[in-house]
Amino acid sequence: MGQSQSGGHGPGGGKKDDKDKKKKYEPPVPTRVGKKKKKTKGPDAASKLPLVTPHTQCRLKLLKLERIKDYLLMEEEFIRNQEQMKPLEEKQEEERSKVDDLRGTPMSVGTLEEIIDDNHAIVSTSVGSEHYVSILSFVDKDLLEPGCSVLLNHKVHAVIGVLMDDTDPLVTVMKVEKAPQETYADIGGLDNQIQEIKESVELPLTHPEYYEEMGIKPPKGVILYGPPGTGKTLLAKAVANQTSATFLRVVGSELIQKYLGDGPKLVRELFRVAEEHAPSIVFIDEIDAIGTKRYDSNSGGEREIQRTMLELLNQLDGFDSRGDVKVIMATNRIETLDPALIRPGRIDRKIEFPLPDEKTKKRIFQIHTSRMTLADDVTLDDLIMAKDDLSGADIKAICTEAGLMALRERRMKVTNEDFKKSKENVLYKKQEGTPEGLYL
């Protein structure tokens, strides 16, 4: 009995041993497998990518991006299928609109007739029709005034801009930028005509004080008249070469326009540009195209020509002074011009260009043969003393034809026979027949 009490363990002793075992220190579960790697330092650290261990959050992001990629692929496939199903005409229209957006749309030019309010106006186009249109908000309203040129949308004709320089392109072409090569030395004879045009056109522009001291007003314009080929246009070219003033050249037929009112408008633009670039000279060749005598006509074209001439009369001697703007006109038929056009006050000097006399013919022949290689037997006296009505243009044609005949026969010198044959050819073509004595 005593043995069992001293040597045996009771139930209370077993519980005590279990408590001692639980109190023992247990190390935490390591969170990283393997040894801790040392951080690399130095220049090689930037080139190495950091190690990313897979986590739950990264896995979710990857799945989300893959899902978005699938959606984008589905959308791309859907758009591709829709493009294939689209009709051919609709596809071409869309491509055409893209091309138009890239290269821009053209704009038409109109004239502002009247401003209704801040957002609306009445404009007219080149075809003569008027439109009630809107003014877009980005247009500078301070630049809008009746009569100015505006840019219009080609579909709705809305005002989308203002042209600052509203000069007609036809007037810009009329302005002579480069002076002609002809000078007074290239004109044979015509000494009196040269003196008169210098007194009427050049001196008032270069030395206006001479006329102020004399107490007279300089001539406003001159008209050059005479047979064809007598040097009227040549003298005008020499004036453009000698003077430093702006030279505007226009042919009378250019002032005849297709639409109603364009001819008078072109005349106004011509003189407005001349005043802006004063001192200037306006040369109107073949003035008889618009300056013929007025008469009652039922033709709309004839009435438009007469309105153009009336505008020219107003510009020559109207209410406003033209300043340093001189006018030179040229015509072959002065007897057909309207008396109001060539009266004093508008055209103060009428300069006649007759056919050349013997002295003038000799000078013209000398000018045109100065650069030609002539044979020893050439005597121009027979051509000069002839009673044929030769103009300066005819003499130039004779010299040119003689040179061509020598060139045809491979000769470098022009003989007297060449001049005789060339004269016969020129007279034959001029008279449109056979001259007398050709076959005698």
Swiss-Prot record:
Residues reported in the UniProt entry to bind ATP: G226, P227, P228, G229, T230, G231, K232, T233
Lipidation residue positions, type N-myristoyl glycine: G2
Keywords: Acetylation, ATP-binding, Cytoplasm, Deafness, Intellectual disability, Isopeptide bond, Lipoprotein, Membrane, Myristate, Nucleotide-binding, Nucleus, Phosphoprotein, Proteasome, Ubl conjugation
Residue numbers of Phosphotyrosine PTMs: Y439
List of residues that carry Phosphothreonine: T53, T434
GO biological process, one term: proteasome-mediated ubiquitin-dependent protein catabolic process
Clinical note on disease: Birk-Aharoni syndrome: An autosomal recessive disorder characterized by failure to thrive, severe developmental delay, intellectual disability, spastic tetraplegia with central hypotonia, chorea, hearing loss, micropenis and undescended testes, as well as mild elevation of liver enzymes.
Protein name: 26S proteasome regulatory subunit 4
Gene, per the UniProt record: PSMC1
